Design a protein with these regions (language model features):
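Active-site neighborhoods of enzymes that stabilize oxyanions during catalysis
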Residues: 152-156, 342-502, 508, 512
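Active-site-proximal N-terminal segment of extracellular/periplasmic enzymes that hydrolyze or transfer
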Residues: 22-78, 84, 88
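Phosphate/oxyanion-binding active-site loops and adjacent basic polyanion-contact surfaces
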Residues: 151-152, 228-237, 267, 271-281, ...
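Sec-dependent N-terminal signal peptides of Gram-positive bacterial secreted proteins and lipoproteins
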Residues: 2-23
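Short, solvent-exposed turn/loop segments enriched in Gly/Ser/Thr/Pro and often Arg
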Residues: 79-98, 173-183
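Metal-dependent active-site segment of extracytoplasmic phospho-/sulfohydrolases and closely related
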Residues: 278-322, 327, 515
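Active-site metal-binding loops of divalent metal-dependent hydrolases
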Residues: 50-51, 305-308, 464
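His/Asp/Glu-rich, glycine-adjacent segments
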Residues: 101-102, 106-265, 420, 427, ...
Length: 520
């Protein structure tokens, strides 16, 4: 089991050395340039760059360290205010992006959460030590099968499913959410199956073209599968180049570029190192065209970040909000242990936000909230009572209560019933109109998290500079972290080239409809 942990946890979760490719193959790639031809309809390439942020992006461009991104920016439209999903964790964001729905509909609550029906903690990869305690096999099964085929609600449709119904083809490269209508077989590397109880194959449903590291690839000569089992940027870019060179790029392609996230977590939000590295990969893609400008012919490029990151205080004792310590009077479910009759609460920390679950009738959700309200590092605490969401804060008197429907409207034309102290979520009101300040689209995003799962639970959100930890949570003191609803974690850049078609609402949850409208 130790060997398996090293293979999966380190290979998948930790960036290793640069992938080893075949030089002859790389030379062949350079020679095989694309011949541009006119097409009847444009093709859309969506590049999702994990933790791409406005300030380091602009800095890298100004210092001429990101010529590919500078090229796209020069030839496109730009905004730094695309609103992410909530929690601002990749799996939830990916779910909103690909389904056009918040977690109340997609049912993907976060990177780690407690399944009230199964009475177990689910993780999609929140740090090596947490995975070790919860079980590597269960984690692998979640990623390989459960996530797309079970957990993602059947009541929402992915962009791949909608495109299939429109008789359009699509591709997914290294994106963990990819559900579609085509049957695929994911093959687990033999090195892993030999030392584990994982099956050799997983059956899954995806788009017509699916690439996911060493588990499934289109280019059999793509040798970038050593580093993180192919779940790396070099692998992803080689797959995109292959589709372009073979002229098999479908109407829609989503490509996930992940490694910048690891760099920002370690070095902090100001670093440009990750951007400089990923830009070299984008240069590889542009270089296969006779001229970079040819890449824009009949191709619409959409480049987005998924979440921002905010700096975490260097001093661990101050930076890390230890929820086990704060709630030490309660009996807390241990990671990897079955629920016992004496257990009272479950803690699942998602970096700068956390879910705290009541699993014993003797516990009061309000009492837990009241206890957490005394910690000055926590921005606010929320829970639900019937159809109403209640929010309190240590910085403000009283409470704020809201639910969907009512006489108040926000800039997204969403109607709400609200009462109480609006300062808690930094809302301002004018003539029945709601304006968001520190928490963009705060009501819909918080409602989405509160309705994402069953049971009684609390949502806690940290102030900038602080991060929650549970039993074995990863921590990023001195670096960067995300997860919260605050604008520092929530506003990301977007670059769009090749079209003047406006996006009605600058939210990740709205991009699916905007893309599908190209073929309506």
């Amino acid at each position: 089991m130790t060997r398996l942990l090293l293979i999966i946890s380190i290979s998948i979760l930790v960036i290793g050395c640069t992938s080893c490719g075949n030089k002859a193959d790389e030379q062949e790639m350079k020679v095989s340039v694309i011949q541009t031809e006119s097409q009847s309809s444009p093709k859309i390439i969506l590049l999702v760059i994990d933790s791409l942020m406005n300030e380091p992006l602009k800095k890298a461009i100004q210092e001429k360290k990101a010529p590919a991104l500078a090229f796209f920016l020069k030839h496109g439209q730009y905004s730094k205010n695309l609103v992410s999903s909530y929690p601002t964790m990749s799996v939830t964001i990916d779910s909103s992006l690909i389904t056009g729905a918040y977690p109340d509909q997609s049912k993907i609550p976060g990177l780690v959460w407690f399944d009230n029906n199964e009475k177990q903690i689910n993780t999609y990869g929140n740090g090596m030590f947490e995975i070790m305690k919860l079980g590597v096999s269960g984690f692998a099964d979640n990623i390989m099968h459960q996530y797309n085929n079970v957990d993602l609600s059947p009541n929402v449709r992915s962009i791949h499913e909608d495109l299939y119904n429109m008789k359009k083809d699509s591709a997914s490269i290294n994106a963990f959410i990819y559900r579609g209508n085509y049957h695929h077989t994911l093959k687990v590397p033999k090195l892993i199956t030999k030392v584990s109880n994982l099956p050799e194959e997983y059956e899954t449903l995806g788009p017509k073209i699916l690439s996911l590291g060493a588990f499934i690839r289109q280019n059999t000569k793509n040798n970038h599968i050593v580093n993180r089992i192919g779940l790396n940027d070099a692998f992803a870019v080689q797959e995109l180049k292959y589709l372009l060179e073979k002229n098999i790029l479908p109407e829609f392609t989503i490509l996930y570029i992940s490694e910048n996230d690891f760099t920002v977590h370690r070095k902090g939000p100001d670093t440009t190192k990750g951007i400089e590295k990923l830009d070299k990969h984008l240069q590889e893609v542009l270089n296969i065209f006779p001229k970079w400008e040819d890449a824009l012919n009949n191709n619409i490029w959409v480049i987005i970040g998924d979440s921002n990151q905010s700096s975490v205080n260097e001093r661990k004792k101050e930076a890390l909000i230890d929820l086990q310590e704060n709630l030490s009077k309660y009996r807390i479910l241990k990671l990897g242990k079955p629920v016992s009759k004496d257990d009272e609460i479950v803690i699942t920390a998602n970096e700068r936000m956390a879910y705290i679950y009541k699993i014993n009738e003797s516990v009061s959700v309000k009492n837990i909230a009241g206890k957490l309200q005394t910690d000055p590092r926590i921005a606010w605490i929320a829970w639900k009572e019937k159809e109403m969401i209640h929010v309190i804060s240590g910085d403000h008197k009283g409470s704020f209560i809201f639910k969907p429907g009512g006489t108040y409207k926000d800039i997204y034309n969403q109607a709400w019933t609200i009462k109480g102290n609006t300062s808690i979520l930094d809302l301002s009101l004018k003539d029945k109109n709601i304006h968001y300040e520190d928490y963009p689209d705060g009501l819909a995003r918080l409602y989405g998290a509160m309705q994402s799962q069953e049971g009684e639970f609390i949502v806690v959100d940290a102030k900038p500079g602080f991060e929650f930890i549970g039993e074995s949570s990863p921590e990023h003191s001195g670096g960067g972290a995300h997860g919260s609803m605050h604008k520092e974690d929530s506003l990301v850049p977007i670059i769009v080239t090749g079209t003047n078609k406006s996006i009605d609402q600058l939210r990740i949850v709205d991009l699916k409809k905007w893309i599908l409208d190209f073929w309506n």
